Amino acid sequence: MEEMPKNYDPQAAEPELIEKWMKADCYGRSKGTEDRTVVIPPPNVTGILHMGHAMDDTIQDTYIRYSRMRGYSTRWILGTDHAGIATQTKVDKKLKSEGISRLEIGREKFLDACWDWTREYGGTIVSQIKRMGCSIDFNDEKFTMSPEYTQAVRKVFVDWYHDQLIYRGKRIVNWCPHCETSISDDEAEYADEKGHLWYLRYPLKEPVNGVEYITVATTRPETMLGDTGVAVSPQDPEKADLVGKTVILPIVDREIPIFSDWHVDAGFGTGFVKVTPAHDPNDFAMGQTHNLEQINIFDEHAVVVDGYGEFSGLDRDQAREAIVAWFEEHGLLDHVEDLDHSVMHCYRCGTTLEPWLSEQWFVAVDKLKEPAAQVVKDGQVTFHPERWTQTYLTWMENLRDWNISRQLWWGHRIPVFYCDDCGWQDALMEDTDVCPKCGGHHVHQDEDVLDTWFSSQLWTFATQGWPDHPEQLEGHHPTQVLVTARDIIALWVARMIMSSLYFTKEIPFHDVYIYATILAKDGSRMSKSKGNGVDPMDLIAKYGADAMRYNLLTLITNNQDVKFDAVLDKKTRELIESPRTDQARSFVTKIWNASRFVQMNLDGYTAGMPKAETPEDAWMFSRLAKVVAETTEQLETYGFGEYARNIQSFFWNDVCDWYIELCKGRLLDGTPDQRLQVQRNLVFVLDVSMRLLHPAMPFVTESVWDALPASGLLSHDAEFLMISEWPDPEKLASFVDEAAEHNFSLAKTVVSAVRSSRARYRLSPKTDLAVVVKAPAQDVAALKEQAAFIQNVGRVSSLEVAEAPQKPAGSVSVTDAGLEMYVVLGELVDLAAEAKRLQKDLESAKKELSGVERTLANQGFVAKAAPEVIEKKRARAEELTTLVAQLEQQIADFS
């Protein structure tokens, strides 16, 4: 048996293992009686890995590795998204750097440039996913612009078009003047901004009861050029006399009516609301109701169109300034108020979006949303954590028709064709240049492309042969679970459910697992613009993939967001450290060192069954069996954080700190039979532990497992740990021994109390101490039976156990797990001086705690201080509260 190296080097071991696994085709579909198929949320084809991807992919790989070991037929589908706006923006930028514009080279050459870009940079994120250790089938990569996938997208559009679920119409859309395309409601990002509320006077055509003008309040004076009405609330009786009257719109001298409408909030501004149907969704709705003219005053660049004199040619910001100046100059600016309000921005470039009337393609959702809501209500699709169910259902209730057209070139071109000769129009599965109605040749295709989410909504079934080979879906669809972020519950999850129900007549997945958003250390969202994003590849380079993966899993709780503790260089933004990931690396080292110690002491080992020959053996086997059952249940129910924390606590505390330490005597000084049996026991415990740890930390566990001989209970026939068997909870259930666990835990409690007392009073670990234990009647006998063990392991010179013993002089008391232990310190410690010191420390801690609590109770401080400062104060208050309790307990120990 080749000895394990002294140090484990993840940078050398991890890439080597990836190559071995792939060469042996371990990532392909595994065989089993039951299926578990998972689709990876497709990242942008030319993107790079970020922390959200790292969390998502770690969770999926943990689940897939576990399911593969459980014997399921697993399939994890890899693929990338063509990312319409993102890719086109990057190619546009590249061409501009070369002095070229896409308009100059035309659509076809621009698309060639997009394909070149995709081929050049498209493999980056896939290679990064591979470096993480994701056991996904890299030989079967999907792409949303592949010929097969494009046909699926086209069929969905054509079928919905002919089923009258897709229509074209003029609607208010969120228009990005920079990207020159519409953005769906769900893609718009909102930001609070400081703005103004301008009060503008509009003259009445004829005075009413001596009133010559009305005053409207608006945040967007520049759009007044397109006003075609003024609205008041039906619940505002003071303005009833003005309903039906006419206003002369300043600058353009347009006559516009005053009307009442329920959209108006009588308490906003003056109660008079300017109505601009072409530039506001609510105004558009009022315009439809009251038959108002729709006047678009901006072009696609948000520049005022011709026909408005000195204001034409101005962009919207310039127009705002000029129009406000005009109103002020003509005595029609009443006053201006400061206003904080929420403003929509493009998620891609950050430009303020413009509500803009344009002709777009829409999906009518009324017939689609009810079935999609019902499958969640009746439990066919389950959200984890459960609280996201209501988020989904609320969004479905308020769902509006979906704008699916984008004014781009890169993407799935809308397959609608028009005849310029006879006006024929239809959606087709095949391109045509001949009109089927009149035979004319003046046929052209719609210029727009489909929203990226339109194609990605088909991801669970279009990646598996649909529509040409629906038989490939059998046994693999619905998929098992979709792991994704909360940001796209509306954008993607809901639409996947709607389209899958419509086209496959079944749900796309049984479960939806929503993971927490990873925030920067200060609690802000990670982003390129802020420079606070952490590159997962930097973490892997510094700490190894296992450490990063394990740290991410332990971050998972039921909280909505988690802070990542990475420290970045303020200038270069390069990673300096991540203390939690460093702790995870220490766990990797612990696994390696503990396993190496056992492997180095296996001389003369032969495989054989584990057998409990000592109390610690019985305790260990019982704990092991329970942890197998617990981790199995946790992974089955998507409890990834609980699983990771459970297995670490077990392996580090129970296996390493206790069991291996307690086995050293038999391993090093036992009889040949004792030595062989403890070797078998240790190999068995390590074998099971590596299997349990493997889904989270595949590399170090594979390396350890490969270095270990076969245990006598679990099969070691598989070439790799990743395709070996998961420990069967039922087969190990016979190891559970509640009495053995309880009794040994009592002994551990006493030993821990003695050790902690030595540490607390700064005594040498080799100092023998006398101990008296006050125990419940039912535990006295068990403790006495283990007296030799306690005295040997705990370095206890004498041990007394009784129900009601006398507390010895010069002793301190430690209470834990129903036991009261008196540790005799005698002359080893000056108890009076120690008590005095502790009392002084207690008073100091209480004083500081009082000051921190006063600060946190100060509303002025809480209102003005930065969130990270407040969080630091709260953390300090928690630390001091714990310290006060500890000091009070230590002082009480002397009594």
Name every feature range the model reports, one short phrase each.
Residues 5-6, 79-82, 110-115, 139-150, ...:
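Conserved short loop/turn motifs at secondary-structure junctions
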Residues 97-112, 382-383, 537, 558-567, ...:
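Short, polar/flexible loop-turn hinges at active-site or ligand-entry regions and domain interfaces
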Residues 179, 252, 349, 420-422, ...:
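Short Cys/His-rich metal-coordination motifs, predominantly Zn2+-binding knuckles/fingers
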Residues 198-206, 245-250, 344-347, 417, ...:
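Short acidic-hydrophobic surface loop/beta-edge motif
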Residues 199, 394-454, 458, 502-545, ...:
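Feature 926 captures the class I aminoacyl-tRNA synthetase adenylation module centered on the KMSKS loop
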